Amino acid sequence: MQTSLDILTETDPAIAGILQQELQRQRDHLELIASENFTSAAVLAAQGSVLTNKYAEGLPGKRYYGGCEYIDAAEQLAIDRAKELFGAAHVNVQPHSGAQANFAVFLTLLQPGDTFMGMDLSHGGHLTHGSPVNVSGKWFNVVQYGVDPNSEQLNYDTIRELALKHRPKMIVCGYSAYPRIIDFEKFRAIADEIDAYLMADIAHIAGLVASGHHPNPLPFCDVVTTTTHKTLRGPRGGLIMTKDLELGKKFDKSVFPGTQGGPLEHVIAAKAVAFGEALKPDFRDYCGHVVENAQTLAQQLQERGFKIVSNGTDNHLLLVDLRSIGMTGKQADQRVSQVNITANKNTVPFDPESPFVTSGLRLGSPAMTTRGMGTAEFTEIANIIADCLLKPEDAAVTEDCRQRVANLCSRFPLYPHLTSPVPALT
């Protein structure tokens, strides 16, 4: 039976070659970017399906186009599975991305010029939580909070003081580079004091929430957004969830027709597949290993003398503060790339460097845990990272680390069903 790559090789060898080379890169590299993961073959199959052919503006049972009976069935399945997975009363599975989901929520709950609170990007927040370069920072008055300078963790008393002073209409919690448990109940208490909405963006930790390895925000938050990839291990896309049915209807309108047109039903079907996978017992086991592996990586790097932001991690990611070894995040990112490790430079709290340089390296465990690696392999990964960063100019160390990476990758194959040879690029 022909794979999608086989078909592409026959019809468009140029793009087939690019795809095959990217597949080989993913196979040959240690993927440690915290926001990346490897979907199952089933998710890939659903996303590359005939559902891409169908326009389906509206919601299941309320479409503006005919011929949507099977589209409705797929989307409703995604909705029902997401409700079961997170314990939500209302779910919209149509946002094309987490950023789209967040913008739809802002459009629903805020008016231009309203004040909201979100975490500073340099402390672990996200662009869509009020960065001045994002629409969230252009349309609204943003009060940013950060972490405590000593613990490098959230200080809820300080956040409360800011909230009482500025009285925002909404508080956003949930982050892109925060390695610790978030206390949603404390955020709820703060929001209630000022009669504010509470929004949680769990894009990074959604899989951990679904599996019980991180507290669920839904009992405490008015609305929860997430992406469907990262720790949830689905296709790239967004999700909006709430326990409030009336608010849910408003979010639906802000997605369509407010910010989007036709939904990507092939992606929604792939979301349904991923949610179904996440409802199975082995997904809980997987997420447990994700946390164990991240903690192992942090501990082993600490033993090699590296400073870890907040002194560890409770979730899937960790931040390495490189100032102690006189290296920038940009330099470290480039250095680990030389030995076929993919990571990303990242600001650390109170970072003196620009976002284009940074003082930190963000590392995550989800992707390589998906490939089957455990604490023994993550111990070796930590030592490879330490060896190559501590001796950045040593060619022998570079070659040794590259070979150790190759050995690890060969033991844990990726997508073995995709076996097409690499076609020549033209």
Curated annotation (Swiss-Prot):
Keywords of this entry: Amino-acid biosynthesis, Cytoplasm, One-carbon metabolism, Pyridoxal phosphate, Transferase
Cofactor: pyridoxal 5'-phosphate
One matching Pfam family: SHMT
Catalytic activity annotation: (6R)-5,10-methylene-5,6,7,8-tetrahydrofolate + glycine + H2O = (6S)-5,6,7,8-tetrahydrofolate + L-serine
Modified residues (N6-(pyridoxal phosphate)lysine): 230
EC number: 2.1.2.1
Subcellular compartments: Cytoplasm
Metabolic or biological pathway, per its Swiss-Prot or TrEMBL entry: One-carbon metabolism; tetrahydrofolate interconversion; Amino-acid biosynthesis; glycine biosynthesis; glycine from L-serine: step 1/1
Entry GO CC: cytosol
Positions marked as site (Plays an important role in substrate specificity): 229
HAMAP family, per the entry: SHMT
Subunit organization: Homodimer.
Family note: Belongs to the SHMT family.
Name of the featured protein: Serine hydroxymethyltransferase
Taxonomic placement: Bacteria, Bacillati, Cyanobacteriota, Cyanophyceae, Acaryochloridales
